[in-house]
């Protein structure tokens, strides 16, 4: 345990940030999984809807500093390549 006052405060803020980031990452994984499953099932409308929602969440996570912009771009690209063949 830290003895310095500023470090004690820093530990508290780090823990809050860690929990917040964990929640955001968890919801991201869920959104991406929904889009992938809809694409695998061949449901064009649902896949498109979920892909759009996942892309939006990825962009928000980048703006909050939870993930890197290249990681978000990579995930969005992978989702798009799964959904695109369904559209025809």
From Swiss-Prot:
One of its GO terms (molecular function) is small ribosomal subunit rRNA binding. Keywords: Ribonucleoprotein, Ribosomal protein, RNA-binding, rRNA-binding. GO terms for biological process: translation. Signal peptide: none annotated. Residues 1-28 are annotated as: Disordered. GO terms for cellular component: cytosol; small ribosomal subunit. InterPro entries: Ribosomal_bS20, Ribosomal_bS20_sf. Pfam families: Ribosomal_S20p. Belongs to the bacterial ribosomal protein bS20 family. Binds directly to 16S ribosomal RNA. This is Small ribosomal subunit protein bS20. It comes from Streptomyces avermitilis (strain ATCC 31267 / DSM 46492 / JCM 5070 / NBRC 14893 / NCIMB 12804 / NRRL 8165 / MA-4680).
């Amino acid at each position: 345990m830290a003895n310095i006052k500023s470090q004690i405060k820093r530990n508290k803020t780090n823990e809050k940030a860690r929990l917040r980031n964990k929640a955001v990452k968890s919801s991201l994984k869920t959104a991406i999984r929904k889009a992938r499953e809809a694409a695998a099932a061949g449901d064009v409308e649902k896949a498109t809807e979920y892909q759009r929602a996942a892309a939006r969440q990825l962009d928000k996570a980048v703006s909050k500093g939870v993930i890197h912009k290249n990681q978000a771009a990579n995930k969005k690209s992978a989702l798009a390549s799964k959904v695109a063949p369904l559209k025809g």
